[in-house]
Amino acid sequence: MFSIIVPSYSRNREVLELLESLKAQTVYNFEVIIVDDCSPQAVVIEPNYPFEVKVFRNETNQGAAGSRNVGAQLASQEWLLFLDDDDRFANNKCEVISQYIEQYPQINFIYHSAQCEMVNEKFQYFTSPIEPNKINLDHILLANKLGGMPMMGIKKSFFIALGGLNSELKSLEDYEFALKVADSPNLKAGFINQPLSICYFHTKRSSVSTNTENTEKAIEYIEHKYVKTEKQKQNFAINSLYILSYIYAMNLSRKAASYYFKIFKRSHNIKHLTIAIISFISPKLAINMKRFF
């Protein structure tokens, strides 16, 4: 039924912990494909799991997107699921999704909500994806309301037909793939309103300068490829500011406030002004507002 694709680089302990967590799945209708992205120390897995585990090692570093594409090519099952080595599936995810597919066999793409854990701040919130009938470029250019790769399942044949993930991008690969899905005339989507993935987020973990440079390049690429109408231009202008604000917000930087204020000037939404003020006063408090916004 499923091939679960896990890209990993120099995180052997996390890979082993992830595999242990998958033992708790209520059904074992899946294989796991670990794509070792040319780590200095190769991933080694002992064959003691109640499901098949395959390990493939890239000869050169391909990045997360390229490694997921490699895993997709190696997959032997009809459906692809994606999991990062520091995230988790709900214990019933594979069972719930397989039951949904049996009920709606015409679909080729499935997505669901997620439980997001803010590790340092010690709180959680849940994503709210849009309904399938609202999936279009206008909506996804305004905000990625499909989610990242751990919130998606896709038929291998559809994934290959779409060209997989863009391995040239160093940022926003998940978002660009969501736009690719939304833009496809062959999309047959299904939605499960359950948080079937648990994603962990850490503030002050990454480089602001590197992230900003890569993200700005990705934004430029996405705008050139997908923005065609005036409405799409307006929507993506707002979302681009939000994407850039997120980098600073996750690093607890007051610079996030300037981006939220720019969003407010475009949206005239008092919520954005409120977040701008809170971000300037206390970036940490602004992160905690995710509980409510």
Segments the model singles out, each with a brief description of its role:
Residues G66, C94-F158:
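Flexible acidic/His/Gly-enriched loops in nucleotide-sugar-dependent glycosyltransferase catalytic domains
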Residues N58-A75:
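Glycine-rich, basic loop-to-helix element that forms the pyrophosphate-binding segment
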Residues L80:
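Short aromatic/hydrophobic "clamp" motif used to bind/position activated sugar donors
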Residues E131-E216:
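Conserved nucleotide-sugar donor-binding catalytic segment
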Residues M1-S3, S21, E31, E176:
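Cell-envelope/extracellular polymer assembly enzymes that use nucleotide-activated donors
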Residues Q194-T203, S207-N235, R254-R266:
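Catalytic core of nucleotide-sugar-dependent glycosyltransferases
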Residues F2-E14, L18, Q25, V35:
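A conserved hydrophobic helix/loop-capping motif in glycosyltransferases and polysaccharide synthases
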Residues L19-R57:
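Acidic donor-binding segment of Leloir-type glycosyltransferases
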